[in-house]
C-alpha cells in the first residue's frame, strides 16, 4: 500500500479498529527556538491519560544509561578512522566548538560529538517539545513512558559504521558547519510549515548525511518496532505519542504503517 500524500499537520488522531478512545500522534523536532504547544495539542493532551515519547525521558537513570553507550567499542578512537591531516583538522574544530582536546573526546562515537554541536545550529536558546510535553503530563499527574529503551536507541548508533559517522563530523569541520546550518534552517522551515511530505523528501534526497544512507536503521526499522507498542498503549488507554516528525511520513512511516493495520489516522487541522 503506497502512502497517500499527507495534509500539512504535525498532529494526527488515531481511531477505529476497535479503539474505545482516540489516541494522538504528534511529530516533534528535538531542537527549536519556540516549542510552544498550540491549542490542538493542548486539547489532545487533555483528552489523553498517558504520554509516550521515543524514550522514557523522565526516567532518573536516563543520563547514566546514555553515558554507557556513547563510547566506541573495542577501544576505537577517531585516530583509527581518519588520516593524519583530517585528525589535525578535527582536533582544531572540536577544541574550538566544544572546548575539549580531541585526545579527551576521541573515543566518543562521532554521532554524539556531532550532536554536542547541534545547539550551535540555532541562534537562540534551545527549547524542546519533549520537555514541554513532559511538563503538561506532570501537571496532569500522568505517566511518561517510551517506545524504546535507551539500549535500543543506542544500538541504532552502533549499527551505523563509525566510518560513516566520522564522515559527517569531518564535513562539518571542513566548512565550519555552514552546510549543517543551512540544512537545519531548511528543516525548521518545513517543520514550521507542518510539511511532513517536504521533510520526507528532504531526508530522501540529502546524500550528504549518513542518516539518509542508513534510513532503514535510523527510521524504518524503528517505526516497524513501534507499531505493536503504539497499538498496545492505545488499546489500554487514550495515549499521546510524541516522536520525531521524520518518523511520520512515507511508505514506512508510522502514519502509513498504522493505516495498513486498519486504523484511521487523520490530520487534526
Task: Please give the residue ranges for each predicted region.
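Tryptophan-centered motif/residue detector
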Residues: 10-12, 191, 226
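A generic structural signal for short, solvent-exposed coil/turn residues
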Residues: 4-6, 17-18, 45, 233
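Structured, acidic catalytic/metal-binding patches in enzyme active sites
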Residues: 14-24, 29-210, 214
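A cross-kingdom marker for long, charged
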Residues: 212-269
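Bacterial Sec-dependent N-terminal signal peptides
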Residues: 1-7, 12
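A conditional alpha-helix N-cap/helix-loop micro-motif detector
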Residues: 4, 34, 219-223
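Amphipathic coiled-coil/heptad-repeat helices and related helical stalk/stem segments
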Residues: 7, 37, 129-130, 223-226
Amino acid at each position: 500500500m503506497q502512502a497517500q500524500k499527507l495534509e500539512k499537520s504535525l498532529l494526527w488522531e488515531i481511531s477505529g479498529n476497535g479503539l474505545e478512545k482516540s489516541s494522538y500522534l504528534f511529530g516533534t523536532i528535538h531542537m527549536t527556538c519556540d516549542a510552544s504547544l498550540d491549542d490542538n495539542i493542548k486539547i489532545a493532551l487533555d483528552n489523553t491519560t498517558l504520554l509516550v515519547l521515543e524514550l522514557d525521558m523522565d526516567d532518573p537513570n536516563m543520563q547514566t544509561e546514555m553515558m554507557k553507550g556513547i563510547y566506541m567499542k573495542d577501544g576505537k578512537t577517531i585516530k583509527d578512522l581518519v588520516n593524519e591531516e583530517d585528525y589535525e583538522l578535527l582536533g582544531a574544530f572540536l577544541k574550538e566548538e566544544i572546548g575539549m582536546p580531541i585526545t579527551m573526546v576521541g573515543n566518543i562515537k562521532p554521532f554524539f560529538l556531532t550532536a554536542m554541536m547541534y545547539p550551535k545550529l540555532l541562534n537562540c536558546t534551545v527549547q524542546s517539545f519533549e520537555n514541554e510535553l513532559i511538563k503538561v503530563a506532570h501537571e496532569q499527574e500522568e505517566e511518561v513512558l517510551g517506545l524504546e529503551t535507551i539500549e535500543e536507541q543506542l544500538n541504532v548508533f552502533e549499527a551505523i559504521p563509525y566510518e560513516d559517522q566520522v564522515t559527517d563530523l569531518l564535513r562539518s569541520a571542513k566548512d565550519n558547519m555552514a552546510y549543517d546550518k543551512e540544512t537545519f534552517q531548511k528543516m525548521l522551515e518545513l517543520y514550521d510549515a507542518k510539511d511532513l511530505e517536504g521533510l520526507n523528501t528532504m531526508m530522501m534526497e540529502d546524500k550528504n548525511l549518513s542518516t539518509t544512507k542508513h534510513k532503514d536503521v535510523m527510521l524504518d526499522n524503528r517505526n516497524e518496532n513501534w507499531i505493536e507498542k503504539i497499538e498496545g498503549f492505545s488499546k489500554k488507554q487514550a495515549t499521546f505519542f510524541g516522536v520525531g516528525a521524520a518518523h511520520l511520513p512515507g511508505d514506512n512511516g508510522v502514519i502509513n504503517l498504522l493505516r495498513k493495520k486498519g486504523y484511521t489516522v487523520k490530520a487534526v487541522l
